[in-house]
């Protein structure tokens, strides 16, 4: 008996394609382009970082070399190098790189907020005097009360005499040192 044309398809080995676990996920060409563009922007952010900041980001040697080369290149060559960096990033897990970059950006924002708080505290020290000194001593018990009072007194004299705020800057520096030594 000869097989019918439909019957010969049933005997093909590996004919268990109907497995529902192997779903094919279709990704649009536009989405692929958006992802590539996003990785190119990430690469540009990495190129804009300084050497010290780059040291804090987990990069392998060839990606690091490509970034350092892009930092030295100007104009059209830089654009092509950024495209290469984007291509290299597509072949890697970029999540650790993104997390390290976010951490760097967040650290900068936290530092700006801290500086604003210290400036406000410095201004209160100059205006309020001993009441604000007590607050500083509760925040940082190891602070030198005598040095603070001397700096405050000098800052008030400079302010009254319309002189440059040298002592006010010194108060800020001292408060910043206290905050850095604490953390």
UniProtKB/Swiss-Prot annotation:
Matching SUPFAM superfamilies: PSPTO4464-like (SSF158710)
HAMAP family: DarP (MF_00765)
GO molecular function: ribosome binding; rRNA binding
Similarity comment: Belongs to the DarP family.
One cellular-component annotation, GO: cytosol
Signal peptide: none
Record GO biological process: assembly of large subunit precursor of preribosome
Compartments, record wording: Cytoplasm
Protein name: Dual-action ribosomal maturation protein DarP
Record key words, sorted: Cytoplasm, Ribosome biogenesis, RNA-binding, rRNA-binding
CDD domains: YjgA-like
Main location: cytoplasm
UniProt function note: Member of a network of 50S ribosomal subunit biogenesis factors which assembles along the 30S-50S interface, preventing incorrect 23S rRNA structures from forming. Promotes peptidyl transferase center (PTC) maturation.
């Amino acid at each position: 008996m000869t097989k019918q044309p439909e019957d010969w398809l049933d005997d093909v080995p590996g004919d268990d394609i109907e497995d529902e676990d192997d779903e094919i996920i279709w990704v649009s060409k536009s989405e692929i382009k958006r992802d590539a563009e996003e990785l190119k922007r990430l690469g540009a952010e990495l190129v804009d970082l300084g050497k010290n900041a780059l040291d804090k980001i987990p990069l392998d040697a060839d990606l690091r070399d490509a970034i350092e080369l892009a930092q030295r290149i100007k104009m059209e060559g830089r654009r092509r190098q950024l495209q290469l960096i984007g291509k290299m990033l597509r072949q890697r897990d970029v999540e650790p790189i993104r997390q390290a970059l976010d951490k760097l950006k967040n650290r900068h924002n936290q530092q700006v907020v801290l500086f604003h708080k210290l400036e406000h505290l410095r201004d209160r020290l100059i205006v309020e005097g001993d009441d604000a000194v007590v607050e500083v001593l509760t925040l940082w018990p190891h602070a030198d009360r005598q040095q603070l009072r001397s700096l405050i007194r000098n800052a008030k004299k400079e302010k009254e005499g319309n002189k440059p705020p040298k002592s006010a800057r010194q108060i800020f520096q001292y408060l910043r040192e206290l905050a850095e030594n604490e953390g």
